[in-house]
Every structure is written in structure tokens, then in C-alpha cells.
């Protein structure tokens, strides 16, 4: 529900049905998201899951170069901006482009709709803000957290989230425990898992 209120396409797919002539027709898996029409009114739209990614379907496959399609396939993000129609506002402008993994659809975010931060976790971005504005991923190192840890990572604009996202390269969320189901794990196996 939080994604819908923020104007994003939710990641959770649900079975969708529609009543036609008194019968329920199965639409498959999909999600619901708010979209602004040409008049500026907000409407709820149904997004069903596509069998193949939207960038491989006409007319979008003609819009992207082979290199851009390869980048969308591997990373899920274009890595640059593209002049195209924004799906939420309906206007043609420079947009950040990402692939919504759950529905296989393209999501766009107009460049002028996002105010980029000058600091990430208290670390000044500096001249890299222009690279971030152009859609590239930037590396930020030596970020000092309040608990004393020092982390480094990559920041980029994510059209799915509608914001700048930071990926911690140190990955503090991955913890290798000493035991699994009560069985002690050797130091060699712990090193291989890390």
C-alpha cells in the first residue's frame, strides 16, 4: 500500500480478475498503480505481468540501441537518460529508465522531477552529482557511520523507487553464523560463504 501512495508500482503481484457480462475473467498476475492522465487526473491502472520484458516488444525495441537493451537486461537500469514519453505524466522529456522486475515493464522518471541530494550518509557528493544527474552510477567511499563503521558503495537513480538508491558494497546484512541447525561450520566453509 505504501508504494501505491508514493506513486510507485508495487512489487507484490496478486491474481487479478475482471467481471465481464456477469462472468469473472482471469487476467493473470498483476498489480495496481496510480497514473496521471493528460488532463492531470490520477487514475488507478492495472499492470499485468508481461511474458517478456517491455523493451523487447514493439515499439520499445526500436527505441533502444543494442547496448542499452543489454544494460537493461543485466542491470535493470539504463545507466543514462533517454528522451522518451514519461509513463506517469504522459509528456515527452529526458527520463531515467528502469525495468520493474515483478511486471517486466519499463518505468520512467523525468530528470526534472527529481531533486538530487548533495550528501549521502553525510558524505559530500561533490562533482559526481553531474554524473548522477546523467543517469550514471557513482562510487562513494569512506562513509563514516554513527556506529563507527566505514562503508563504501554505489549510488544511482532508480526510476522504480523514484529516488537515488545506495548499494552498500561492504554488505553488512550478510552474516555467516558459526552453526547451521546446530552443526558447527568450519572456518574454511565460513570463508567460502563470505
List PLM regions with ranges.
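Gram-negative host-targeted secretion-system effectors, predominantly Type III and Type IV
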Residues: 1-194
Amino acid at each position: 500500500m505504501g508504494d501505491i501512495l508514493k506513486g510507485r508500482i508495487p512489487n507484490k503481484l496478486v491474481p487479478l480478475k475482471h467481471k465481464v457480462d456477469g462472468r469473472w475473467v482471469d487476467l493473470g498476475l498483476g498489480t495496481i498503480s496510480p497514473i496521471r492522465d493528460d488532463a492531470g487526473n490520477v487514475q488507478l491502472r492495472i499492470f499485468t505481468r508481461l511474458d517478456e520484458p517491455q523493451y523487447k516488444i514493439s515499439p520499445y525495441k526500436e527505441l533502444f540501441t543494442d547496448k542499452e537493451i543489454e544494460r537493461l537486461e543485466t542491470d535493470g537500469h539504463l545507466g543514462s537518460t533517454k528522451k522518451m514519453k514519461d509513463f506517469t505524466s504522459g509528456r515527452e522529456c529526458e527520463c531515467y529508465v528502469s525495468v520493474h522486475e515483478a511486471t517486466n515493464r519499463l518505468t520512467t522518471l523525468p530528470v526534472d522531477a527529481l531533486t538530487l541530494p548533495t550528501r549521502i550518509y553525510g558524505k559530500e557528493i561533490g562533482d559526481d552529482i553531474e554524473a548522477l544527474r546523467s543517469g550514471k552510477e557513482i562510487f562513494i567511499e569512506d562513509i563514516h557511520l554513527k556506529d563507527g563503521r566505514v562503508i563504501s558503495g554505489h549510488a544511482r537513480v532508480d526510476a522504480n523507487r523514484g529516488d537515488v538508491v545506495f548499494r552498500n558494497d561492504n554488505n553488512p546484512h550478510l552474516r555467516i553464523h558459526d552453526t547451521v541447525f546446530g552443526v558447527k561450520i568450519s572456518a574454511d566453509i565460513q570463508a567460502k560463504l563470505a
